[in-house]
């Protein structure tokens, strides 16, 4: 449409490419100010606005300014789009933490599977837009119809058969461009809808991290692998939560008012400091509630019901899976949801029933209702064998390089044959590891309700040992502080040696 010259286009691409820089610089400020969830909503909403604004500009704006207005829309869209480079990794990490918080399992690997599903959906829908383009005139029939008019308007064409020539016709261009904008707006709108249900706030995320640390504390203590640093950090979290158990949130509005009423720079600085401290105090109170709820989780009615179910399942063992009545799932779904507590009970009942139904299917199909516990110690043996073979291969290659240097053809042939056999052996081990992984996965799926019940009972038992862990606090803290001091002294020593070495080199050069 001859919207700009070649020089103007070069300038436009340069300016447009710079937008992402500012987006990535502004993203942390937005996250700090309004949080990740609201930032996601904001940028996706603005994405719709800026994309949609391009169409009326192209259709109605004067040609002399049209390209610059389009540049503004594209630049702003690229700016808010660049927020995603900062937000996406952070949001994905938060989602993983939340999943571990609610299920007790880390499912990082599943995110790759979800990405593959997205790729398949993209491939399946990639033909939709070209089909729509063809319907509105982006086809050879339309080109043949408009070709005389286009040639009269543009002069001789390099390739008259190129279907893209129809874009020289303004009405056709506007129609096709409108389809592109409409599809983009619809896609952006569909993308923003899920974020209206994203309710994981920064405060809740901080609380989740602390709860996960508490769970790790008891699990590590039960397994005899608790580190001094983890013990000290987590007990401090619990102590702070207990100290804030009866605390009341501070009136943030009063602190904001104090900032406005401050008459000089120093007073305003003090007021802002007090305001930030009050905000953090309120955050600590909210987090302490989550920590205390976690500490008392097995003392609640819901927690006791979970333990009773777990004891029953663990005592029956795999028979609990074989004999499970699948109608229990329908009964669970029929439970009332009138109150928040009832919703929690129903959600748990449905989740437990689904676990049993799925496990029952796997047990019947893969184990003929005779589940045999998988011996996970086989992995240690296989990995050790794999490491040994890899070390032998590395050592053989070292001998091969030496033989090559010495031009010892007999040794070269012998070592190559040796490496070939070692690689075959490693391939066999890798296949055994793969088979063992599959068997372990099948067992975990078939025995899932029993495994979860056993884990819950162990977790509840570990939670009763808080006093034992607290009794180790002072000694662990002393050891931890000494370790930190030793590390500081060592770091200072290394830094001093570097400076002395650098000074020596400078003196020698002088």
Sequence positions of predicted segments:
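Membrane-embedded alpha-helical bundles of multi-pass transporters/translocases
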Residues: 1-226, 230, 273, 282, ...
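Intrinsic disorder in cytosolic terminal tails and internal cytosolic loops
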Residues: 166, 199-405, 411-510
């Amino acid at each position: 449409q001859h919207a700009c010259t070649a020089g103007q286009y070069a300038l436009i691409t340069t300016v447009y490419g710079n937008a992402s820089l500012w987006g990535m610089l502004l993203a942390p400020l937005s996250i700090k100010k309004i949080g990740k969830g609201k930032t996601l909503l904001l940028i996706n909403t603005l994405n719709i606005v800026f994309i949609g604004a391009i169409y009326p500009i192209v259709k109605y704006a004067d040609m002399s300014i049209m390209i610059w207005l389009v540049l503004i829309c594209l630049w702003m869209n690229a700016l808010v789009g660049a927020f995603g480079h900062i937000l996406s990794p952070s949001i994905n990490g938060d989602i993983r933490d939340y999943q571990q918080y609610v299920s007790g399992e880390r499912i990082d690997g599943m995110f790759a599977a979800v990405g593959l599903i997205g790729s398949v959906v993209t491939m399946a829908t990639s033909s939709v837009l070209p089909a729509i383009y063809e319907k509105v005139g982006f086809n050879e029939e339309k080109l043949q119809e408009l070709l005389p008019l286009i040639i009269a308007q543009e002069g001789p064409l390099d390739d008259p058969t190129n279907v893209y020539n129809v874009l020289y016709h303004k009405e056709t261009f506007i129609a096709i461009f409108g389809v592109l904008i409409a599809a983009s707006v619809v896609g952006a709108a569909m993308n923003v809808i899920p974020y209206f249900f994203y309710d994981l706030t920064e405060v809740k995320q901080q609380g989740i991290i602390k709860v996960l640390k508490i769970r790790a504390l008891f699990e590590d203590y039960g397994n005899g692998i608790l580190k001094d640093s983890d013990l000290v950090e987590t007990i401090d979290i619990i102590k702070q939560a207990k100290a804030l158990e009866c605390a009341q949130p501070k009136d943030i509005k009063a602190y904001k008012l104090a900032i406005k009423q401050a008459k000089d720079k120093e007073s305003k600085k003090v007021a802002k400091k007090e305001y930030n401290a009050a905000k953090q105090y309120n955050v600590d109170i909210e987090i302490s509630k989550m920590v205390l709820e976690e500490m008392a989780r097995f003392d609640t009615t819901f927690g006791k019901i979970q333990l009773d179910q777990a004891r029953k399942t663990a005592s029956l063992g795999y028979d609990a899976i074989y004999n499970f009545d699948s109608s229990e799932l329908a009964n669970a779904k029929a439970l009332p949801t009138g109150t928040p507590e009832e919703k929690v009970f129903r959600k748990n009942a449905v989740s437990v029933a689904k676990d049993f139904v799925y496990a029952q299917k796997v047990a019947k199909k893969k184990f003929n209702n005779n589940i045999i516990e998988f011996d996970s110690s086989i992995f240690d043996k296989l990995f050790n064998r794999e490491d040994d073979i890899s070390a032998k291969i590395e050592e053989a290659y070292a001998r091969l390089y030496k033989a090559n240097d010495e031009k010892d053809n007999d040794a070269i042939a012998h070592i190559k044959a040796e490496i070939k056999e070692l690689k075959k052996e490693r391939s066999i081990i890798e296949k055994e590891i793969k088979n063992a992984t599959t068997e372990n996965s099948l067992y975990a799926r078939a025995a899932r309700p029993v495994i979860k019940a056993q884990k819950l009972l162990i977790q509840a038992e570990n939670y009763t040992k808080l006093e034992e862990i607290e009794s180790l606090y002072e000694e662990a803290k002393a050891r931890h502080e000494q370790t930190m001091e030793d590390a500081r002294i060592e770091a200072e020593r290394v830094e001093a040696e570097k400076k002395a070495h650098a000074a020596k080199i400078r003196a020698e050069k002088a």
